[in-house]
Amino acid sequence: MKRQLATTFAVAFLAATTPGLAQNSVKDALAKHWKTTGEFTIAVADAMPADSYNFRPNPEEMSFGQLMAHIAMADVGACAVASGLTRPELPPKLAEWAKSSGKAEVSKEAAMPFLKDTFDFCDKAVVAMTPERLDTVEGPPARNMTGFEWLWAYFTHTAHHRGQAEVYLRLKGIKPPDYRF
């Protein structure tokens, strides 16, 4: 009888705690990979010389600097929506870029600190997320997603544009940093 009672309690305990454990492991994985993607993206951004931040493969493409600003702007917004934390203010040079609908050039001097601040903010945002926040639907009607979906969507958005940035580097004859995961 004692063994049956102990088994019943053990099964009940596991059933009650497993979803939380699963959500924590998802959150831990998100935190780990957001940190890595931030470090890798910053390394890619740093590999481009300052005098080539206005380089674009063709006139329709964003310049390298605009691409870095786009990554940071999108990520800071997504991490704020996902976590509920207040997004940091844009530095003046990046606010100017945003007001120009992304048409103004962005220097390495302006882009690098913003990228670093963005990934610091996203690291804090992911760590601050509760299991409930990961499952809460947030955002404008056209982009109603759970906190998890916001983080995952913009993690992949970062990878997409970082891949573009690596092509820009290669077109300039620069070997991109080795892949990190």
PLM features per residue range, with description:
Residues N24-A31:
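Short, low-complexity N-terminal intrinsically disordered segments enriched in polar/charged residues
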Residues K99-E138, T146-H157:
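Acidic/histidine-rich alpha-helical segments that form the ligand environment
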